[in-house]
Amino acid sequence: LNLRGKGIMIGFLDTGIDYENAIFRNIDGSSRITAIWDQTDQNGQSPDTFTYGSEYTNDQINQALKSDNPKEIVPVSDENGHGTFLASVAAGGENIQEGFTGAASEAEIAVVKLKEAKDYLRKFYGIRQKAVCYQETDIVQGLRYLHLLALKKQKPLVMCVALGTNLGGHNGMSSLSRILGSYSRLVDRCVGIGGGNEANERHHFQGKLNQVGEVQEVEMRVESGNTGFVAELWGTIPNIVTAYLISPSGERSPVISIRQGSRYQLTFP
């Protein structure tokens, strides 16, 4: 099948994009990127109905590509490289010399460069200092931006969200999951989600308690130097689960009844 994505738009929510890369250009040298919303840049013009970040249009990107200093016109970058890699695989153009072509090499490209999560959220969830981390509110706003952009351009839209989390029940009932589901049910909308990529990280554990009073111990290894960590326990209704903690030196906490809104502070000698 000679399907190259012509006539559709693929939107990426990620670390940004190297818009100067030739793989994102047409044969005449113009950019295939229809727009970029850089949530980290507060110096430019925000998109309509949004109150932060800077939007750069296809005209501005083409102007930058013709300039001796493109970053003075469109100061968008991808320090991490993940967003550029993802866009290359999904929508990169043909490179005959390298024997490469993206899956949808003629699709229009739209990009949301997500801003990092706020410091208080990173601290609350124990996120490592150098870890790439985004908050759901910015992701939701990015999805809305792509949806409105596709409506404006009258294009079918594929939302590419190659982000992951170890939090939540992974049952499709979180706020973000429901929002993604609502977009996927719209005409001319498709949602692509990255999954897995955990390999042998052992971030998850599943157990089964068959009898009342049955106990199952789980060892949690916390990286040296961490000041805290977050763990979630998920059960099935109507079962009630209790837990206790054993410190590395052997102190054991009282049994904790896990109820909504409960808070406990435990001090070990």
Residue spans of the language-model regions?
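Surface loops and adjacent helix of pleckstrin homology
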Residues: A22, I246-P248, I258
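Exoplasmic/lumenal beta-rich domain surfaces
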Residues: G44-N58, P254-P269
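Subtilisin-like serine protease catalytic core
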Residues: N2-Q135, Q154-K155, D188, N226-F229, ...
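Short Trp-Ser/Thr-centered turn/loop motifs at beta-strand boundaries
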Residues: V215-E217, E251-I258
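Substrate-binding/access-modulating region of protease and related hydrolase catalytic domains
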Residues: K118-L209, G225-S253, S262-Y264, F268
